Amino acid sequence: LLTPLLKAMPQKIDEDMVIKLAKDMCSALELCRKHGIIHRDIKPQNIMLLKSGIIKVTDFGIAKLPNTETVTMTDKAIGTVYYISPEQASGRLIDPRSDLYSLGAMLYEMVTGQLPFYAESSVSVVLMQVNDDPVPPRELNPSLPRGLEQIILCAMEKDPEYRYQNA
């Protein structure tokens, strides 16, 4: 899983590794999109990094599959609060751009060593996901290339219309 890699790093993951992981994740998410699948729980614990360097997306347990209309369970948002998209956190309709938001949150953590939003309660984190902008990554990691920061912030736009439209 990617989680041990994040925990093993003193602060942040090497930018070349982040870029490679981002490209591989985008390929995986694009394949999901082409098959009509929305993962809905993209987070480090659901990404396997094989010894060969290949990544595998795991845990499609709450994925939205093609031709299913339910996007929430009993009107509750599902997913992991630290990586959940604002629309998913609000119980609104989601599409593949929700997974891109989650990927952006993961990348943010990789390059800064911090979650984009953190609070003691899950409810507070959800409210931050919906209402607050993250601290710009370069404020936490000044050596981060501006282009990579822009990619992360675009993926984490609150409004899906302003995010990347596909992986």
Where are the regions a protein language model picked out?
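Protein kinase catalytic-loop region centered on the HRD/HxD motif
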Residues: 27-37
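AlphaC helix of the protein kinase catalytic domain
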Residues: 1-13
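Pre-DFG segment of protein kinase catalytic domains
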Residues: 56-59
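Activation segment signature within eukaryotic-like protein kinase domains
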Residues: 21-22
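Conserved activation segment of eukaryotic-like protein kinases, specifically the C-terminal portion
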Residues: 74-84
